Amino acid sequence: LYSEFEQIAERLEQHYREMQDVEFTIEKGKLWMLQTRDGKRTAQAAVRIAVEMAEEGLITREEAIGRVTPEQVDFFLHPQFDHQAKEAARSAGNLLAAGLNVSPGAAVGVVALDADMAERWATKDGKAVIMVRPETKPDDVHGMLAAEGILTSHGGRTSHAALVARQFGKPAVVGVAALKIDLGARQIKVNDQIIKEGDWISIDGTIGEVYTGKLATIVPEVEDRWLVKLLSWADDYRRLGVWANADRSEDARRGRNYGAEGIGLCRTEHMFFEAERLPLVHRMIMTDLPVERQEALDALLPFQRDDFAGLFRVMDGLPVIIRLIDPPLHEFMPNHVDLISDLADLKIRLKHAGTLGEINELLEQIKEKDRVLKRVENLREDNPMLGTRGVRLGILIPELTTMQVRAIFEAACTVKEEGVDVRPEVMIPLTSHVNELKVQREVLEAEAKKVMTEQDIEIDYKFGTMIELPRAALTADRIAEYADFISFGTNDLTQTTFGISRDDAETGFLIEYMENGILPDNPFATIDREGVGELMDIAVKKGRAVNPKLECGICGEHGGDPQSISICHELGLTYVSCSPFRVPVARLAAAHAALSGRQQETGT
């Protein structure tokens, strides 16, 4: 009977060319087959079954690629909660809250309510930490890196917390409206439940849930040999290049290990937030004297040079796109509201000061705090995301971007002497008018050539720009006269095309828009083909009409979204760039897009 059953099962699998879940019975010594259907499977099983069936000749490699979804590949890249443990937690009433699932994976740790506490507990005490904040800012990055996961009460899919979490592969849940954070009492509250700092919580960034207590996790195997083989097949069929966003050499190494063919975005401003560098940045911002500003920039240069050299060494033989400073300067300074509060506290303490020494010390602190506050107020803008940032900052403070370009080319010359094949590409952000790019490129390319002359070394390089504004997309033919490449920053391009705030929309009207079918998808998660996609199409066609070899890529968060990758393939982009942790997903999605396009062409 067993032999007969084995033969029938084999025949069914061969006929349906799919793993089967069969029901049978044995009555009076006779085998009866009751029904058969395609079997359910885990992500690991789906990959292995597809590869084995292709190797057995039951299906083609193209079919094997098509049978595995990008979401199943994503499972291999992040810890997940044990299913039974999660169900038990639900049954016990331990599901605390839900928010936006902005960075996949499961994380368990104690609550830390600020970045310094998160870093101290994680590095000095060896604790697993979940950093919980109303929202994160650039000066929270050190705590975010130390934490196992990130939880915020505000923010959307393209908020600072979401972007950084995806960049560094940290599970994150944001926009948890029910979460009330009391920094004074060092506790959080959801409805009537209070969680104190130091209590254990578990967050699921894959589906956006928060649990009290510790849930068991499962760590998948990234180097699964079946997955490695399937992705190698995917690489044979995809046309789109897949690059990685990386600000540090370890991120670049991870991206390359996952199959990235270049760095599509290095955010230089992230390098400024290291503890030993931020005071130099503050000095540069605080002074109005050119000599003092240059001294601060000269002190920053070696840090930037070392960072770039590390990236170049890891990416030996592959392109590295380095974006010059993008955010407005006030983002590097203390928060305006915090400064006002601190100043008020100091003045209250001054009223109650008992000794002359204490009075003098407080007066000095008040004077310095007031100086910083005035500078921050001078830098403040009503709409900083459309204010003095990107190329505008480089034009107003040319010595800042000149320092960055010098650091890039000094690093490139150094590593080339070591035998490294270095390929820097300098990206100027937020261009809206061709003359901005023309002016900046002239200044910066002159500095690059000056460094190469000083070092007596020639470097193959490119200068390009980000297309983040509708005007830039519509005038890409003019921009292409001065750009060797363009890269779509689709976060800002979506924001400026729709005229909505990416930081506010996902916790506001956008949810209702999607629930009521006003918008089919979240445009910050998947490219809006009719609007943003149309602008991209215009830019690619206009740009390549002037320069047929124009390299066109995408480095926004959409670069790791399978639906957006399909649109990028359709538009003829050169590459997509995404978080290192999304590279395997993007490789498979790019193959899906290529195979789907081929089927449409042949009508099969």
Model-derived segments and their meaning:
Residues 1-7:
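A short, contiguous, amphipathic alpha-helix enriched in charged residues
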Residues 15, 32, 80-85, 92-94, ...:
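Acidic, glycine-rich flexible loop/linker segments
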Residues 17-39:
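Conserved metal-phosphate-binding beta-hairpin within the catalytic cores
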Residues 21-25, 61-67, 79-84, 312, ...:
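Short coil/turn segments at secondary-structure boundaries
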Residues 45-53:
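Catalytic, metal-anchored helix/loop core of enzyme active sites in primary metabolism
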Residues 61-108, 433-462:
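Amphipathic alpha-helical
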Residues 222-226, 233-604:
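Conserved alpha/beta-domain cores
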